Regions:
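Conserved catalytic cores of phosphodiester-cleaving nucleases, focusing on short active-site segments
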Residues: 86, 113-115, 123-130
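A short acidic/basic microdomain associated with nuclease active sites
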Residues: 89-106
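Catalytic cores of nucleic-acid endonucleases
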Residues: 130-189
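Interdomain/boundary linker segments immediately adjacent to catalytic/signaling cores
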Residues: 1-76, 80
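Charged, terminal alpha-helix-loop-beta segments
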Residues: 16, 72, 89-93, 149
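Short beta-strand or tight-loop elements
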Residues: 109-111
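Amphipathic alpha-helical segments that form well-ordered structural scaffolds
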Residues: 80-89
């Protein structure tokens, strides 16, 4: 498996656990390299339009980020870093949903990420949890709490009748991977 300085990742069946111990130069460069594609999706990032270039994308990110409470900011950073880590370290997955909510300058509702598995051509619905060490808990206990929360959130979303979560997920994936017909077929089927 590839490595990224400052990032430790543990992959298990059905989930992955990531710890970022150092915001290294290598991680910073990966952030810069992937920023527009992560935020806007593959198609828009390659369009050449000024609004999808690096500097306007940084400004758009900060506009969304700076007005949020600390807990939401941590969640946004966790989701954003998940995009980077998946793009850099997991060869068998590609992110199929952009980070930015296209309808409003807020966080996305519903599923955090959609991943496309290049090995089995399936779409994975992904929930990201991030945070700091919980009071009175060690790293393992905090990780277990975050994983349990992610599992319960996914279970709830997958079993609720909120059609908007599914429509948003399909729309985001469709936009992000519009140039790859086989991806779109998987998502829409």
């Amino acid at each position: 498996m590839k490595t990224l300085d400052g990032v430790q990742i543990l992959l298990k069946s059905g989930y992955g656990l990531c710890h970022i111990s150092n915001f290294s130069d290598e991680l910073k460069q990966a952030l810069k390299n992937h920023l527009t594609r992560i935020c806007h999706g593959e198609t828009h990032s390659r369009s050449g339009y000024a609004m999808y270039r690096y500097k306007p994308t940084v400004e758009a990110f900060l506009e969304r980020y700076e007005k949020k409470p600390a807990k939401t900011q941590k969640g946004m950073i966790g989701e954003f870093l998940s995009h980077i880590i998946i793009n850099e370290l997991l060869d068998n997955f590609e992110t199929a949903s952009p980070f930015f909510n296209l309808e409003e300058k807020s966080i996305k509702k519903g599923f955090d990420l959609l991943l496309y598995s290049t090995s089995d051509h399936k779409v994975w619905i992904t929930e990201v949890k991030s945070g700091e060490l919980r009071k009175g808990k060690d790293v393992n206990e905090t990780s277990q709490l975050l994983l349990s929360t992610a599992y319960n959130d996914l279970k709830t979303r997958l079993n609720e009748n909120e059609i908007n979560h599914w429509a948003n997920a399909m729309n985001a994936a469709s936009i992000a991977i519009s140039q790859h017909r086989n991806y779109k077929d998987v998502v829409l089927d």
